[in-house]
């Protein structure tokens, strides 16, 4: 299976650089995975695509202001992107600098916060923050929201609110589970009033979500690791939904990865820990029946997951339709509602 199987040409002007004025004002392209039929909709029409037997599952991870600017003790500029917390004062991080710092060096960040480089763990640096404030509190004071590289502008105040779901409650992500950005309080109330149930998993999205696939044969790609929690409570909700003949509707590819990691033995079970699950065409889905997701970059593992779910031919045809119709792409862009292409 070749990387070139997952490419498409996207006009640059369709890459959304800002969110819509209000949540939920996005467009929604529905795709029947079994037939390939697409229909142009608005995201506020989502309740019409769901039944009272269905279960919506959200990722409640919270994006941390993980990007910090500073200088090395030599005076050179440096940028830190936190990947994950180790404890209240230590973290693993990516560092961008002309010459990466060695173990034992001190960095001076915003508000004169000092950071000690403890060593390296593969491509990441282990850092110790020499500040009495716990890291989550410290980052709120000195950090910036880590916008994706294809949003080619500086962070603005609105990003702190809009690059975050309204139900985010578990700090730890360095990228938003973007399918959830479309949901506002009125829509959640409509879904609840319609009798559609919901639940939550946690997957802390890492910077690896933007990691390019560097091999021509995608089966040789090494997937990045992310932390997942799937509780017994959500497992029970899923079992009840399946027994009642309802659909498990994942809000976002991160939710799909969490649920499929927790279903590795064929049935859903509680899961807590790391996952490196790589979902590409040929994967048999055990838990997820429908997917709400944004449009994804060409040749990425996210697009491969969507192609696994609804079939590459149908997905890429839907993308061509979306481009022709002027849909907005990527994190701040429009969304899709996709039903599974049954493979028997």
UniProtKB/Swiss-Prot annotation:
Subcellular locations according to the entry: Cytoplasm
Pfam families: Queuosine_synth (PF02547)
UniProt entry tagged with the keyword Transferase: yes
Gene3D superfamilies: QueA-like (3.40.1780.10)
EC number(s) from the headed UniProt entry: 2.4.99.17
Sections of the chain in a coiled coil: none
Entry keywords, A to Z: Cytoplasm, Queuosine biosynthesis, S-adenosyl-L-methionine, Transferase
GO molecular function: S-adenosylmethionine:tRNA ribosyltransferase-isomerase activity
Spans traversing the lipid bilayer: none
Catalysed conversion reaction: 7-aminomethyl-7-carbaguanosine(34) in tRNA + S-adenosyl-L-methionine = epoxyqueuosine(34) in tRNA + adenine + L-methionine + 2 H(+)
GO cellular component: cytoplasm
InterPro entries the UniProt entry points to: QueA, QueA_dom1, QueA_dom2, QueA_sf
GO annotation (BP), single: tRNA wobble guanine modification
Pathway listed: tRNA modification; tRNA-queuosine biosynthesis
Record note on quaternary structure: Monomer.
Function description: Transfers and isomerizes the ribose moiety from AdoMet to the 7-aminomethyl group of 7-deazaguanine (preQ1-tRNA) to give epoxyqueuosine (oQ-tRNA).
Family affiliation: Belongs to the QueA family.
Protein name: S-adenosylmethionine:tRNA ribosyltransferase-isomerase
Organism taxonomic ancestry: Bacteria, Pseudomonadati, Pseudomonadota, Gammaproteobacteria, Chromatiales
């Amino acid at each position: 299976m070749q990387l070139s199987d997952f490419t498409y040409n996207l006009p640059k002007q369709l890459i959304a650089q800002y969110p819509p004025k209000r949540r939920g004002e996005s467009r929604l392209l529905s795709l029947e995975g079994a037939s390939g039929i697409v229909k142009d909709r608005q995201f506020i029409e989502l309740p019409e695509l769901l039944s009272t037997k269905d279960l919506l599952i959200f990722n409640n991870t919270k994006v941390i202001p993980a990007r910090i600017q500073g200088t090395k003790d030599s005076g050179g500029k440096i940028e830190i992107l936190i990947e994950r917390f180790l404890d209240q004062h230590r973290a693993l991080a990516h560092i961008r600098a002309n010459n990466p710092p060695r173990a034992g060096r001190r960095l001076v960040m915003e508000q004169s916060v000092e950071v000690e480089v403890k060593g390296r763990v593969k491509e990441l640096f282990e850092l110790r923050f020499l500040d009495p404030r716990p890291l989550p509190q410290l980052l709120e004071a000195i950090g910036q929201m880590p916008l994706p590289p294809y949003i080619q502008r500086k962070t603005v105040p609105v990003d702190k609110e809009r690059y975050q779901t309204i139900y985010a409650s578990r700090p730890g992500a360095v990228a938003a589970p973007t399918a959830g950005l479309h949901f506002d309080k009125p829509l959640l109330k409509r879904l609840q009033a319609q009798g559609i149930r919901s639940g939550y998993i946690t997957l802390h999205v890492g910077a690896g979500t933007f990691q390019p696939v560097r091999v021509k044969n995608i089966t040789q790609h090494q997937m990045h690791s992310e932390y997942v929690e799937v509780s017994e409570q959500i497992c029970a909700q899923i079992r009840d939904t399946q027994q009642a003949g309802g659909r498990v509707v994942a809000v976002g590819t991160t939710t799909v990865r969490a649920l499929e990691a927790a279903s590795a033995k064929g049935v859903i079970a509680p899961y807590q820990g790391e996952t490196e699950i790589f979902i590409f065409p040929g994967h048999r889905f055990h838990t997820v029946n429908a997917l709400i997701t944004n449009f994804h970059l060409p040749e990425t593992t996210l697009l491969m997951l969507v192609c696994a779910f609804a079939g590459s031919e149908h997905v890429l045809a839907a993308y061509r339709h979306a481009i022709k119709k002027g849909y907005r792409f990527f994190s701040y862009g429009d969304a899709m509602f996709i039903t599974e292409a049954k493979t028997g």
